[in-house]
Structure formats: structure tokens, C-alpha cells
């Protein structure tokens, strides 16, 4: 639920390495 400051519209989330995932075109961490 916490925004990771990254979008995932065109490319995947780089922040997946710290637990973030793509939701609604924005990367979130829980």
C-alpha cells in the first residue's frame, strides 16, 4: 500500500528488489 515513487506503465517496477509490486500503473510496497 505504500507508493514506491515509481510507475510501471511502460516498464516493470525496478523496486521489486525491495518488495514493491505493480498495481494500477504504480509501484506499491504493501
Swiss-Prot record:
Swiss-Prot/TrEMBL GO biological process terms: defense response
Q: Does the entry feature the keyword Zinc-finger, yes or no?
A: no
Give start-end ranges for the coiled-coil region(s). none
Q: List the disulfide bonds.
A: 4-20, 8-22, 13-27
Describe the PTM: This is a cyclic peptide.
Q: Which SUPFAM superfamilies match?
A: Cyclotides
Taxonomic superkingdom = Eukaryota
Alphabetized, the UniProt keywords read: Disulfide bond, Knottin, Plant defense
Q: Please tell me which positions the record assigns to the cross-link Cyclopeptide (Gly-Asn).
A: 1-30
The written remark on domains in the entry is: The presence of a 'disulfide through disulfide knot' structurally defines this protein as a knottin.
Q: What is the role of this chain?
A: Probably participates in a plant defense mechanism.
Q: Which family does it belong to?
A: Belongs to the cyclotide family. Bracelet subfamily.
Q: What is this protein called?
A: Chassatide C9
Amino acid at each position: 500500500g505504500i507508493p514506491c515513487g515509481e510507475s510501471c506503465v511502460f516498464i516493470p517496477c525496478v523496486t521489486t528488489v525491495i518488495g514493491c509490486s505493480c498495481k494500477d500503473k504504480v509501484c506499491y510496497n504493501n
